[in-house]
Amino acid sequence: AELCTHLFIDEAHHAAAPTWHAFKSVFKAQMRHVLQFTATPFREDGLPLDGEIIYVYPMRQAQREGYFRPIRFSSVYSFNDARADRDIAAKVIEELNADATGLHVAMARVSTQIRAAQVLAIYQALGHFNPVMLHSGMKKVAAQAARSQLDQRQSRIVVCVDMLGEGFDMPELKIAAFHDLRKSLAVT
């Protein structure tokens, strides 16, 4: 830190983690400049990020400037959960079939690993786009195989528990199907 005048931190919403906090404190103790960047200015624990916000680029502005398209929302109404899961899966297949590029990938979000297996079976029964499952309880080899199928476009549907999380970079991920909590489909 003695040789550096500035510290630049990307993904700053993680900067409260003990290692980052200790690293930052060395710079702050020496009155060095710390600049933090994040597209997610919210911490998991609900506490605010430290420091002064000097620039905000809202999603609405990014959409207006053409970086993101507006979200197209489709909802599925059913009083029967099993039927709703099938209807959402069918809508995902419909959206993927309508994709002119043939490159879009869909994420089907569920709340538990048991639900992931159940919802995966629904997508598999529809017989399109070779769905795979990804969650933290999978063995590393199985998770890598599923990710490889997505990367190589052998699969275009991934069933996951909650969201895929930080570091999951797949620009072709355009469709989000929420099987738990909300029964909806968001297409970007």
Residue ranges and their predicted role:
Residues 130-133, 138-162:
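Conserved helicase ATPase core of P-loop NTP-dependent helicases/translocases
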Residues 157-160, 164-181, 187:
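A short beta-strand element within the Helicase C-terminal
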Residues 7-9, 159:
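Walker B beta-strand of ABC/ABC-like P-loop ATPase nucleotide-binding domains
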Residues 6, 13-70:
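Post-DEXD/H (motif II) to motif III coupling segment of the RecA-like Helicase ATP-binding lobe
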Residues 10-11, 163:
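Walker B catalytic acidic pair
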Residues 1-2:
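Inter-Walker segment of RecA-like/P-loop motor cores
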Residues 53-116, 121, 127:
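Conserved interdomain linker/interface between the two RecA-like ATPase lobes of SF2 helicase motors
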Residues 37-41, 112, 161-163:
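A short beta-strand-to-loop transition that corresponds to the Sensor-1 phosphate-sensing loop
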